[in-house]
Amino acid sequence: MGMSKSLSCFGYPLSIFFIVVNEFCERFSYYGMRALLILYFRNFIGWDDNLSTVIYHTFVALCYLTPILGALIADAWLGKFKTIVWLSIVYTIGQAVTSLSSVNELTDNNHDGTPDSLPVHVAVCMIGLLLIALGTGGIKPCVSAFGGDQFEEGQEKQRNRFFSIFYLAINAGSLLSTIITPMVRVQQCGIHVKQACYPLAFGIPAILMAVSLIVFIIGSGMYKKFKPQGNILSKVVKCICFAIKNRFRHRSKQFPKRAHWLDWAKEKYDERLIAQIKMVTRVLFLYIPLPMFWALFDQQGSRWTLQATTMSGRIGILEIQPDQMQTVNTILIIILVPIMDAVVYPLIAKCGLNFTSLKKMTIGMFLASMAFVAAAILQVEIDKTLPVFPKANEVQIKVLNVGSENMIISLPGQTVTLNQMSQTNEFMTFNEDTLTSINITSGSQVTMITPSLEAGQRHTLLVWAPNNYRVVNDGLTQKSDKGENGIRFVNTYSQPINVTMSGKVYEHIASYNASEYQFFTSGVKGFTVSSAGISEQCRRDFESPYLEFGSAYTYLITSQATGCPQVTEFEDIPPNTMNMAWQIPQYFLITSGEVVFSITGLEFSYSQAPSNMKSVLQAGWLLTVAVGNIIVLIVAGAGQINKQWAEYILFAALLLVVCVIFAIMARFYTYVNPAEIEAQFEEDEKKKNPEKNDLYPSLAPVSQTQM
């Protein structure tokens, strides 16, 4: 039969500890791999940001659509235990294949460090990701439900606590993996050419998935395993279709109404199946509003991360990168879950308040809505600090005097005086049809120029004499979306120069011309200037000042009297000033909402599902996550909202409306005990059929010898 009651630890079945460790390792594997995907697509395979993002979100969506398939396999064919084992094997193979796809030497026959056939790597990677999506999605609804199966009747408190521990394991694995795997990626490895170590970074998640599988199998002898119930989904669909058809045939008033529309299936299906379907449909009906929560929650990895790129990551002695702010969510979960279970919920119970599962979920949705209100308020404050970029019908220009004389620059409506080696304080904005000419005056010499300026762009006018100038299109229309710093160089030597800065090369910068911007993370960056016109005795190595977040600078390279280079820095875009720590309140609100919404949702889905449909209902719960991501694409894409704070308010308002609707729906929901209902049906069947000990033997645990 099942596990002995003596095999317990601290009042919990010993088997669940294997399940929790299994989940920790699996989540480490999944999130560690997922943290690398975008950079792998862009830097290794060479896709642009848009295609990389599309493939990434397609993969994530697939991971949340395949749980339906996993639930069907578990409930109709293999059972939860075997489904977890076999799909974990598929999962492990997928991780290994993905790691293989990142090995340069797979097609690098000439050993130059670049794959000779990228399509081969793409094909291998896609096969690996498909296997991972099938594996991780397939086991998602089974593991939590299988853990719930291990508890005896009367252990509801321990089972509820298990779902909290289970969720804690998920986030602990996620936190460690998102810290460790990026650290491994930046290491250098390779057989012939040393470069970013994607094979090992993907390989560690593959190893953890293998460990997850081994740990799960070790606990096999302790698990309670239930026989699969047959193709239950097919029965459910047929029963529902028959009920609808039968009701439609008997729609005239001469036929008496029945208590529930599913009761119209009684002519063909037994009452026990109908009662089970009623339980499932009532819960699925409650699921309808839930995707809106995930629509907001999953924007931590997109909109909130982009918001962080416009902020400063200096927090005391720490320096936080924009994408690392997501770890705040995981850290807060690890802190809040024990506090909620050990302090908050017991206090609420002592106060005599009936804090039901659906009430908790309603509170969670409200907190998530308030998190986006906080994000909107923060965005308004951030917008006040951001530079103004030109609109589609505008041009912006600043003047940089790289000559040896003072100059007066006359533009429509304003005149500025520039000393040698200086620039205007800020970019000046004009309608594209008003800036038709500029006067440059030096002493008694006046030159009128008619620059060609591109609408919607920033430009720099390099001037070194009234009749010697160059207009440079800056190419910056926004701050870096990664919080990086843009650096360009202007050469005033008569010969071209080359600059190497932190491994990036600015090649052949022409005389009195500017390079393109290249982008760097925060910190002090060293650079080397080289040219045929610079003597070997000259100093060539320089260091930048400390680069903060989101800035842009022009480094002017001029010749001293000795002919040696001299560097002058000019600020093009100021660094971010709002600190990322201001995001913590919104992360606290969204995480608090997640703790009372998501953990409770898992617990509620299990407790209200009949014994033969628990995995299906868990899959339905996970499906709401996929639908939530689709909502983000629809609202964000169709809304065309220019102000980000307004989009945050829109999402907050939508969830608030959905929260009210859900509260009303929850008000009319009646909690049931599926085990009691099924036991009553069993008792009734035994009375009707005394010769049969058990009409539904599938409800009994299976002997280990049968597995």
From Swiss-Prot:
Residues 383-583 are annotated as: Extracellular domain (ECD). Keywords: Cell membrane, Glycoprotein, Membrane, Peptide transport, Protein transport, Symport, Transmembrane, Transmembrane helix, Transport. It comes from the Eukaryota. GO terms for biological process: dipeptide import across plasma membrane; protein transport; tripeptide import across plasma membrane. Optimum pH is 5.5 for glycyl-sarcosine transporter activity. Residues 75-82, 140-161, 220-276, 349-361, 605-618, 666-707 are cytoplasmic. GO terms for cellular component: apical plasma membrane; membrane. GO terms for molecular function: dipeptide transmembrane transporter activity; peptide:proton symporter activity; tripeptide transmembrane transporter activity. Electrogenic proton-coupled amino-acid transporter that transports oligopeptides of 2 to 4 amino acids with a preference for dipeptides. Transports neutral and monovalently charged peptides with a proton to peptide stoichiometry of 1:1 or 2:1. Primarily responsible for the absorption of dietary di- and tripeptides from the small intestinal lumen. Mediates transepithelial transport of muramyl and N-formylated bacterial dipeptides contributing to recognition of pathogenic bacteria by the mucosal immune system. Belongs to the major facilitator superfamily. Proton-dependent oligopeptide transporter (POT/PTR) (TC 2.A.17) family. The extracellular domain (ECD) region specifically binds trypsin. This is Solute carrier family 15 member 1. It comes from Oryctolagus cuniculus.
